[in-house]
Every structure is written in structure tokens, then in C-alpha cells.
A protein has these predicted regions:
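Periplasmic alpha-helical coiled-coil/stalk elements that build and connect Gram-negative outer-membrane
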Residues: 159-275, 387, 391, 401, ...
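Small/polar, glycine/serine/threonine/aspartate-rich low-complexity segments that form flexible
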Residues: 40, 47-56, 66, 104-135, ...
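C-terminal structured "cap/appendage" subdomains that terminate the fold
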Residues: 412-447
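A short glycine-centered flexible hinge/capping loop motif at secondary-structure junctions
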Residues: 207-211, 416-420, 457-461
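Transmembrane beta-barrel architecture of outer-membrane proteins
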Residues: 61-63, 84, 128-130, 174, ...
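Short, charged, amphipathic alpha-helical segments
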Residues: 79, 151, 214-222, 423-431
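Terminal intrinsically disordered/low-complexity segments used for targeting and assembly
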Residues: 2-70, 235-281, 323-324, 457-478
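Sec/SRP-type N-terminal targeting helices
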Residues: 76-77, 93-94, 138-165, 215, ...
């Protein structure tokens, strides 16, 4: 190739490296609804805040979450993974530029001239200092696309870190609620045991008086033992829940406890979603799926550029002298060289074309995965909205049912003591009261967990690029 042709072709090929990478295919319009059809509260905030746990208005919960953020092992690993991803991105950023190399060394030379076996002249040994600098720039056409792919990998890692953090805090909150429910049920179990013992004493008195058969007292004794067993199981569950909370803050269960004793004081907050299209960038898992799609599209560009010639530029400069000071002070004695090579692979048995087809197939699979993730997310929001409304309605039913069950049991107890009602009537009223108490308590936990699930379904207040301060990682990676 002539110098003139090289002067024209090399800049043209270099310009190809700056070409825009392939854009990912868009979502079909039918995948993104115009609005959510589930019931919403008009007076509620749109989208959750990043400190959504404060909305439950429980100071101890808020303090516990702060301790989780500071001491949780999973969050600590999460921070290190993100810091490692930033280092990887910095390395990728440096790889875009020429690779420099600077060397310095000594060289020894000796001269001798012979003629017909006789030494004509003999030189002395000469020690010279050499200083050389080399800059190599290869992969010119593929590096921009490769770096764009590295950026999507970092964005994916950031979204995954946000998802892990949100799920960890949600797990901590849910476990906190579970412990409070267990303590509510312990109180209810003691009430149930007390109620059962009262009926047991009445049944035994009726047997002693000869107005009732012994089987009634025996059946009630079984009920009493069942309530004692249930109470012991709940006490064990309290320990198990405390152990789970202790692990979340990196502590041993010995000496760990929370002051809260009831779930009834925890408020059930309200929140509503915004436009469905906004959810695409608010949920970490959706954003991660989108970055995977972008990465697959960019990878097609990377593989396509293997069809182009491989360009390599090399620039070098060297200087030598018998004294180091002269090497540094005499640039006029420096030898410089610039070279460029263009290599085009002609035959590869179709391997590069097959690689392109594989990259395209992976892109299509990534689009399908993204669409599935998006549809699942939208459906999660709709289902959770409906579930929140259902649980709100059931809360009213559970409260009124509990009042009715308590009154029914009181009447049955009095009538049984007076001999008006039989044992089966009071046994039925007793069992109804026990189950109704548990249903009332369970409804509160279900409502809180439904809101917690809704916060997660809406992304927990996250936005692309957000790095919370408690992660201890500085934003940016280049």
C-alpha cells in the first residue's frame, strides 16, 4: 500500500471506531400500560421515599434499620462488590487509551578490528545509558464499543447492589414485624389458656355435681393442654425471630432484644404508583434487565467490528549516551519512530459470521427476558394494589368478628355455668374465639407486609445512578 493510500485509509478506519454502537430494540407499546387499574388512595404520596421504613412511624424500627445499614454482613459484601465493579470500570476506562512503556537501562559495547588474523585496532569497553518510551494503541475499532459494554456492566452491577440493599432492608423490616406479631399472639395465647382453664373448672364442677359426664371435663383438659403447647411454641418462635434479627445486625442473640411488644401501634402507611412507564427506571431489577439488553445490543456491535481490519499504532522514542545527564538534557539526540499496521483476516471458515448470528440470538433472548421482567413487574403492582384493598376490607371484618366472638364466648360461658347451654356449645364458642383472635392479629401483619411488598414493587424510592451514603462508596467509576 502506498503512503498516500495509507494516509487516506487509516484516518477513515479510525473514524469507524467512533461510530455509535447498536441501540437495543424498544419494548412493544402493548407491554407498557397507560395507567394502573388497581385501587389507589388519592391522598397518598406518589412513589415511595428512599427512607420508606420511617413511614411506619415506629421509632424503634427506624433505629433498627439504621443499625442494619451499618452492620449487616450482606450489605457489607454488597458495598465491596460495588467498589470492585468501580475498579473494574476504571481499568476498562484506562484500556481505551494507548499503552505507555518507559524503560531505562545500561548497554556495554566493545570493538575490535582484525585483518588476516592480526589485530589492527582494539577499542575500549563503552557503557551507555539508554532511555526509551513506547506508546502502543491496538484494537482501535473495537475499544469504544467494548467500553460502552463495560459501562452497561457497571450499571447492571449498581442496579443489582440496589436490589440487594432493598431486599435486605425489607427482610429486616418484615422480620421486625413478625417478632411483634409473635408477641401479640403470646398475649392472645395466654388469654386463650385462661379462658380454657375457666371452662375447665366449670366443667369439672359440673362433673363433680353429677350434672355432666366426665368426658366433658376430659375434652376441656385436652383443650387446656393444647393451649399450653401453643404458648410454649410461640415463646420458642420469639427466640427464633430475635435470633434472625440479631444476625441482620451482626450480633449474637444472647443479650439482643427489642423493646416493642405489640404490632398494633405500628401504622399502616399509604402510597400510590405513578405512571407505569416511570416504573421502568425505578425498580432495580427492571433497570438491570434493561442494562442486560443494552449490553447484548452493544455486544452485537463488538462482534461485528471483528469484520473490520485490526489497526495498531506504535510510537517510540529512544535516546542513549554515556552519561545519564546527557540522555535527559539532549533531546536532539533522540531517535523517534511512528508505525501503523492494518491487518485484515480473510479466511476464518465463517467463524466471525457465526459469532454475529449468536450475538443476535442472544440479543433476542435478552429482549424476551426484559419483556417478561417488565410484565411481571406491572402485574406485581396490580396484584399488590388489589391485595392492599382486600386486606383493608378484611381488617374491618376481623375487628367486628373478634368483638362478636368475645361476646358469644362470654354468653356461652355464663349459660354453661348456669346449666342452660351444653358443653358442645361452649366448646364451639371457645374455638371460634381462639381462631378469630389469631385472624385479627394476622390481618395486621398481612397489611403491613402488603405495604412492604408494594414498596419493593415500586422500587423502594431508587433511581438509576443512586448510591446511598451508607454504602460508603463514592459515585463514579471512570
Amino acid at each position: 500500500m502506498s503512503n498516500r493510500a495509507r494516509a487516506v485509509c487509516v484516518p477513515a478506519l479510525l473514524s469507524l471506531g467512533a461510530c455509535a454502537v447498536m441501540e437495543p430494540p424498544p419494548l412493544p407499546e402493548s407491554d407498557v400500560p397507560q395507567r394502573f387499574i388497581g385501587p389507589v388512595f388519592d391522598e397518598a404520596d406518589v412513589w415511595p421515599n428512599t427512607d420508606w421504613w420511617n413511614n411506619f412511624n415506629d421509632e424503634e424500627l427506624s433505629a433498627f434499620i439504621e443499625e442494619v445499614k451499618a452492620n449487616n454482613f450482606d450489605l457489607a459484601i454488597n458495598r465491596r462488590n460495588l467498589a470492585s465493579a468501580q475498579l473494574t470500570l476504571r481499568e476498562a476506562g484506562l484500556a481505551r487509551w494507548p499503552t505507555p512503556e518507559l524503560t531505562i537501562g545500561d548497554a556495554t559495547s566493545y570493538s575490535r578490528t582484525s585483518l588476516d588474523g592480526a589485530t589492527v585496532s582494539r577499542g575500549n569497553e563503552n557503557d551507555a545509558t539508554q532511555l526509551a518510551a513506547t506508546f502502543t494503541y491496538s484494537g482501535i475499532l473495537t475499544k469504544p464499543a467494548i467500553y460502552a459494554r463495560d459501562l452497561t456492566d457497571y450499571d447492571s452491577e449498581l442496579a443489582q447492589s440496589a436490589d440487594v440493599a432493598m431486599n435486605t432492608l425489607a427482610t429486616a423490616t418484615s422480620t421486625f414485624f413478625q417478632l411483634l406479631l409473635i408477641r401479640d399472639r403470646i398475649v392472645a395465647a395466654r388469654q386463650n389458656l385462661e379462658n380454657a382453664e375457666v371452662i375447665g373448672r366449670i366443667a369439672q364442677a359440673r362433673v363433680n355435681a353429677g350434672v355432666s359426664v366426665p368426658i366433658d371435663a376430659l375434652q376441656q383438659q385436652i383443650q387446656i393442654e393444647q393451649q399450653r403447647t401453643a404458648l410454649q411454641s410461640l415463646i420458642q418462635s420469639d427466640l427464633s425471630a430475635r435470633a434472625s434479627l440479631a444476625v441482620l445486625v451482626g450480633r449474637h442473640v444472647q443479650g439482643f432484644d427489642i423493646a416493642g411488644q405489640t404490632l398494633q401501634n405500628v401504622e399502616v402507611p399509604r402510597v400510590q404508583p405513578g405512571l407505569p412507564s416511570e416504573l421502568l427506571t425505578r425498580r432495580p431489577d427492571l433497570y438491570q434487565a434493561e442494562t442486560s439488553l443494552r449490553g447484548a445490543a452493544i455486544n452485537v456491535s463488538v462482534v461485528r467490528r471483528t469484520l473490520f481490519p485490526q489497526i495498531k499504532l506504535t510510537a517510540s522514542a529512544s535516546s542513549s549516551s554515556f552519561e545519564l545527564a546527557n540522555v535527559l538534557a539532549s533531546p536532539a539526540q533522540t531517535t523517534a519512530r511512528i508505525s501503523a499496521s492494518v491487518v485484515q483476516l480473510l479466511l476464518d471458515n465463517g467463524q466471525r459470521r457465526r459469532n454475529i448470528e449468536q450475538a443476535k440470538l442472544f440479543l433476542e433472548s435478552s429482549l424476551a427476558t426484559y419483556r417478561r421482567t417488565v410484565l411481571t413487574a406491572f402485574n406485581d403492582v396490580e396484584v399488590t394494589l388489589s391485595n392492599i384493598q382486600l386486606l383493608e376490607e378484611q381488617a374491618e371484618v376481623a375487628a367486628s368478628s373478634l368483638m362478636a366472638a368475645e361476646e358469644a364466648f362470654r354468653i356461652a360461658e355464663v349459660r354453661y355455668a348456669e346449666g342452660v347451654a351444653d358443653f358442645e356449645t361452649v366448646l364451639l364458642a371457645q374455638n371460634t374465639l381462639f381462631s378469630t383472635r389469631n385472624a385479627f392479629l394476622d390481618n395486621k401483619l398481612q397489611r403491613l407486609n402488603a405495604i412492604l411488598t408494594f414498596y419493593q414493587a415500586l422500587g423502594g424510592g431508587w433511581a438509576p445512578g443512586d448510591i446511598p451514603e451508607y454504602w460508603g462508596v463514592t459515585a463514579g467509576g471512570t
